[in-house]
Amino acid sequence: MIKFKQISYNVTSLERDNSDIKFIIIHDTGNRSKGANAEMHYRYFNSGNRNASADFFVDDKQILQINNYNKHYSWAVGDGKGNYGITNKNSVSVEMCIASDIDYNKMLNNTVQLVKELMKKLNIP
């Protein structure tokens, strides 16, 4: 189940429908610190300007959506000012939490389930 908590920073308002979204971007957080789960990343990104954001954070226990991607786009893609075709405006972003105390295989399975759901919902092959 996806839990939703909208962040207040580092998103840009843009009304778009699902057909505007062509790509799903998957990163890991790069944060191996103990306790660096989805909730902790939400709190970090919702506490001030980070010059970055994402749409989803996934750990071994939950999938946390922190941005309504139909109303805002997140700042997750280094898009080369549009030169490469994949932009923040035409993608949604998924961040995998890789903290040292997270069950990596469960987190990976949760990520796969989320991406499958997004592919179906957004009609992305």
What are these regions (language model features)?
Residues 1-125:
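Active-site-adjacent loop/helix surface patches within enzyme catalytic domains
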